[in-house]
Amino acid sequence: MKYTFLAVLSAVTVLATPAPVPTPPNIPSASTAQSLLSGLTVRPQGPQDGYSRDKFPHWITISGTCNTRETVLRRDGTNVQVDGSCAATSGSWFSPYDGATWTAASDVDIDHVVPLSNAWKSGAASWTTSQRQSFANDLSNPQLIAVTDNVNQAKGDQGPESWKPPLQSYWCTYSRMWIKVKSVYDLSVTSAEKSALTSMLNTC
């Protein structure tokens, strides 16, 4: 099958044909996600006071010389080659948020699906540093995913009530990931956040 190139922006190529979508682990079905959402505590966000990314130690060593970022790059990429320090030297990465494919690891961010700041304001402020480190480096749940860097930066610490992936076709998966993480870590949701997640689940 021939690929039709729609655009070339710097190192990115957007493909007309579907690319394999990376699948972080432990994404629930839509029906399970709906049940999990119903079980989440609904309350206003807590204060930002005291928050710092440093309170969520991230990109820790996972295996050998590979840290969390490098591990996710290898998991979510295709034909990824690394050097002796585990830095990706070649490969390609499809970003399911916007449908772009990148060939330089420097153009890819590892997104915390539930942002650290959001977690802080919905329960993580009371956690120990060890608990926050586990959250920030969680490879067992759908909390980390490789995506286009500027899309991740546009998301910032926003919840689904104010930011959704540009590709509407990914809203179903994104909402299921978000809900799973909130459920695993017993984090609260706001009423607007719950409403947005419900609407996104309705696209499944």
From Swiss-Prot:
Keywords: Secreted, Signal. The keyword Lyase does not apply. One of its GO terms (cellular component) is extracellular region. It is found in: Secreted. Pfam families: GmrSD_C. The keyword Secreted applies. Residues 1-16 form the signal peptide. It comes from the Eukaryota. PANTHER family: AMP-DEPENDENT SYNTHETASE_LIGASE DOMAIN-CONTAINING PROTEIN-RELATED, SECRETED PROTEIN. This is Uncharacterized secreted protein ARB_06907.
